[in-house]
Amino acid sequence: MKGQETRGFQSEVKQLLHLMIHSLYSNKEIFLRELISNASDAADKLRFRSLSNPDLYEGDGELRVRVSFDKDKRTLTISDNGVGMTRDEVIDHLGTIAKSGTKSFLESLGSDQAKDSQLIGQFGVGFYSAFIVADKVTVRTRAAGEKPENGVFWESAGEGEYTVADITKEDRGTEITLHLREGEDEFLDDWRVRSIISKYSDHIALPVEIEKCEEKDGETVISWEKINKAQALWTRNKSEITDEEYKEFYKHIAHDFNDPLTWSHNRVEGKQEYTSLLYIPSQAPWDMWNRDHKHGLKLYVQRVFIMDDAEQFMPNYLRFVRGLIDSSDLSLNVSREILQDSTVTRNLRNALTKRVLQMLEKLAKDDAEKYQTFWQQFGLVLKEGPAEDFANQEAIAKLLRFASTHTDSSAQTVSLEDYVSRMKEGQEKIYYITADSYAAAKSSPHLELLRKKGIEVLLLSDRIDEWMMNYLTEFDGKPFQSVSKVDESLEKLADEVDESAKEAEKALTPFIDRVKALLGERVKDVRLTHRLTDTPAIVSTDADEMSTQMAKLFAAAGQKVPEVKYIFELNPDHVLVKRAADTEDEAKFSEWVELLLDQALLAERGTLEDPNLFIRRMNQLLVS
């Protein structure tokens, strides 16, 4: 063949093929769903390009997918008259995987086949799924608008390499022929193929036809029979659509192997006319935190496909939402740039955002277990919401979940509504603490008094939490209060000090002055506190001071971190504080104060600038 060359697969493709053939074999029929789905996408792309260039139809505007098989040759063929591919596109799409981060993702997969099948399915198996049942795959394609002699041939046994060549192909589109492996004869059975198409592809908006051979007057007459409904699912009445159809449609548009958690299908008429079908996945995409991660909705205008991944219709903190919007108010020649600056887009975005938040609120109310699955997968993303979307902040806050001292578990299951319902009489604020880990938050000395008083504290240990709490200032009219910041309401919780205790504290004034003189500018202030029950000392920050966790975030991002000036608070009832106060020798007094400060800093920050000095100092005091 002209222009024939043999090329090696990108290493990631080889890995994917190996994993997929072994992990997805138990559900091997999905290859047909994937190939028909790709053919449908090719038809969508042709329709879109034809808006500006009708000649691409080449006089054939009846788009369809055809499935045929040859029992003698043991081949199954899926063909379409969609947009087709050029030689360069064939090499790009069938020889490589363009997604960044693919290599590390594939390397992270283990030998657990159940887990692998979920993850690989979520990855979007697409064209390569053909190799689950075929030991050789042949592709013949020609791009719309190209001359017949610019057709392309591609063939591979799915091992290490593939062959590509130039051919003549009269009709545009793509034809994929699967040379079935031994033992895969079920895919040469007419009834079996029909049932798979009905199961997985009934929602495809263009006809899926199967070859029908009949004997008439001694001759074999070939015709094509439509198997699916061939009506865009979102245009049908909700009452006519089964849950199974909604799930299969999700798998088609999201290229996901798993069922969605929930969905919402709505048709809006009036000032704005649009139909939306929005899904919440059950599992986060493997590349969700990758900056190149594609997200957004499929955009249709008057049922004509316009683009994938239209990000403009959903805020970033809802980037996990999949689905589509079909608008009657946008023009067919709309571009991403026009969408960016469109009043229609902004109105649609606001409406769809509210719709998703309502969908999540309903899920949380109706099925707490499913909502917990959602939170485990997407909670970190939703936590970006309070900073991004002030208008919907209260609705987002209702959806947040936290660990707390009430549950004694690291699971984030407590809602703010739960917390408020359990607030003590006279309690005006919602108390929380941020730390590097759940264990550090739970054991913080800042919690001692609150625990004694039976007051619940939210335990926040995700990196995003401190940043989120800078924007989330109140809920249900009640302000949030970090227990690691100095606050009058925390001091008010302490038991009232009797006269004799007040006299004893007065006697400690010279001690406090000595500590201030020793530490100088290293701390903002030194004072006595009644917030502690078991701990000798803590460090706190003023309300207007940067918190410890925020300083860590700045440092991790490579930003210049302003020095955090702590308030050093001492427990007058603790034996170590009394011992330090009674020490007259200045050198030993200095050692005691430095040790107490280091302990407080270690509890607050988790690290010390000079841990060896801390250990030496502690050892000296232990033997003295």
From Swiss-Prot:
CDD domains: HATPase_Hsp90-like. Keywords: ATP-binding, Chaperone, Cytoplasm, Nucleotide-binding, Stress response. Pfam families: HATPase_c_3, HSP90. GO terms for cellular component: cytoplasm. Its main location: cytoplasm. Residues 337-552 are annotated as: B. Residues 1-336 are annotated as: A. It is found in: Cytoplasm. Gene3D superfamilies: 3.30.230.80, 3.40.50.11260, Heat shock protein 90, C-terminal domain, Histidine kinase-like ATPase, C-terminal domain. Residues 553-624 are annotated as: C. One of its GO terms (molecular function) is ATP binding. SMART domains: HATPase_c. It comes from the Bacteria. Molecular chaperone. Has ATPase activity. NCBIfam families: PRK05218.1. Belongs to the heat shock protein 90 family. Homodimer. This is Chaperone protein HtpG. It comes from Shigella dysenteriae serotype 1 (strain Sd197).
